[in-house]
């Protein structure tokens, strides 16, 4: 009995480039069209944008709305100074994700419960988080409303346009980062493909590198949803975010091994420009040869 013949793996074709969540699926984008690659990127970018919108809508928007309702009727930031008629230390609203606090005396005694705490002090705004604090003085050139009567209608009218702008900025920034990082990873893909005897062009390596970053972006979208539901705390979210950076490197290093081999492509090529099955029939060696016609003889044979 003869062992069953194993057919070589077929080279990946653009029709297979539809999911970038496995090394083989990412490798398929090396031979896909730019349009197909951009469409898949757009789908993942929209997934990330909608996840971010959902997180902001669930975790931050209710806190901002409640904080505005707790503001006094009169309040203003004028000439770089907060004019506040309420308590000098007052927590306007908070949850586990965000806290808004007024601390005119800069006592910092309000406690730190939320992942991000925004303190409005007498002359500056302070952002406090696990990595430390960042502050910015109020711009003395402008006046800002800090009261319920003005901020309530403004927030009600501009909440959704602001969220839409955040979503648009997220999609655009993701495309810029993906294609920029792909330029950085493309030489690595080309180098790995060379030593692994795999065939890929520079454009193909660029598209493959761009597709290799999509699994990490999907992981960020999942982390946002899990953090919004409270399934992971801020530390868990930070670990997942760090893992998404590692995922891009892993897929860029493993996907080139699923590209078609040089030997497989060479076996399909014919030096005369056609495949053997498509070319003329091969002449038998026993068949008599037809003598070549002399180009200097006349048609009558003389």
Language model features by range: what are they?
Residues 261-297:
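Short, highly charged, low-complexity non-transmembrane loops/tails of multi-pass membrane proteins
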Residues 10-24, 189-202, 267-278:
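Juxtamembrane inter-helical linkers in multi-pass membrane proteins
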Residues 150-269:
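Hydrophobic alpha-helical transmembrane segments and adjacent short intramembrane/lumenal linkers
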Residues 1-2, 281:
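Intrinsic disorder/low-complexity segments
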Residues 61-152:
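Long, solvent-exposed extracytoplasmic domains/loops
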Residues 2-68, 222:
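Internal alpha-helical transmembrane segments
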